[in-house]
Amino acid sequence: MLALLVLVTVALASAHHGGEHFEGEKVFRVNVEDENHINIIRELASTTQIDFWKPDSVTQIKPHSTVDFRVKAEDTVTVENVLKQNELQYKVLISNLRNVVEAQFDSRVRATGHSYEKYNKWETIEAWTQQVATENPALISRSVIGTTFEGRAIYLLKVGKAGQNKPAIFMDCGFHAREWISPAFCQWFVREAVRTYGREIQVTELLDKLDFYVLPVLNIDGYIYTWTKSRFWRKTRSTHTGSSCIGTDPNRNFDAGWCEIGASRNPCDETYCGPAAESEKETKALADFIRNKLSSIKAYLTIHSYSQMMIYPYSYAYKLGENNAELNALAKATVKELASLHGTKYTYGPGATTIYPAAGGSDDWAYDQGIRYSFTFELRDTGRYGFLLPESQIRATCEETFLAIKYVASYVLEHLY
């Protein structure tokens, strides 16, 4: 029986990732102290196949920081030799990626249909958006705000008790395709909001007085690609004139210091900003919706992974928002609330200094539109599993994040503008 379960798990992992096997691949964490170290990493990236996990690209590495990256099996010896020869301190976060890829799925035989404690394929999430709206007509309605590059409908769930001219909070998940815990949280949020409405005073008040616009997966094409072809795909799946490389980083594609810093103009790079701001159908759909609802949207929350961080503007420049002190105090209180459940520690602060400079992000864009409360959440973990957070951690991750979102929402409700 045990052998059968192992075979089922291996078969699932293989089926989910289009034949990628990951055997012998490693994930390194390197301590970077100065520009010389950065140059060594840059040279490595130019001669070997390196997939940067944190930060997103070699251009975002800063002195006195760490960098996490994935290395193909055939390059691991070369990479370790270079790091040792140049006396860079490092550790191996994942010694055999295949084992961790397979372990992200619960070893139990997977039930068909939707589950809030498993990672769901897009077709399952799509069906869920219809089902959850149909089953809860007094609290949820579903709409389509646009289509993806490959022609798929982008669904938005409006969660809240019916009412006229209610203030709203916009929350999206699934910007970067490989960050699977992000869409899992948006689904959990909707379920918990409905389940606890009428039972929990705080949630009931929030849904009575606020609307939540929840976008479960923005980058649907990319998300599907991570299930069928390439588990660590990040970008959209758009094509580009004059290049065979695919995709744009949707979180470098907004008109907020577009492509000025921490983004690339090379279509082959993971942080490609696109040929123009809002060039991607997905980002344009999101931006158009927010512009149309700008008078009612009081907070913007975007859910990513990994790092355990809560960041706020600005990321496209080393400057602070006009209500920076308020954002800092709110972030401090929110991460304290989050930690109260499972002890998970988050760091917080302005994006550029807390994580890295990055232009064209949706949080900065929303803030510059006049949405005073704009936050990015980087969910679990801090690198042990990275983008491969096991399904066994979905519940705890979502429980603590739900606390955080409730805290922010209650604050916003008390500080309407």
Swiss-Prot record:
Q: Which UniProt keywords apply?
A: Carboxypeptidase, Cytoplasmic vesicle, Disulfide bond, Hydrolase, Metal-binding, Metalloprotease, Protease, Secreted, Signal, Zinc, Zymogen
Q: Which reaction does it catalyse?
A: Preferential release of a C-terminal lysine or arginine amino acid
Q: Where is the Peptidase M14 domain?
A: 118-412
Class of enzymatic activity (EC top level): hydrolase
E.C. number, please? 3.4.17.2
- Tell me which tissues or organs this protein is expressed in: Pancreas.
Biological processes annotated in GO: proteolysis
Family named by the database record: Belongs to the peptidase M14 family.
Name of this chain's protein: Carboxypeptidase B
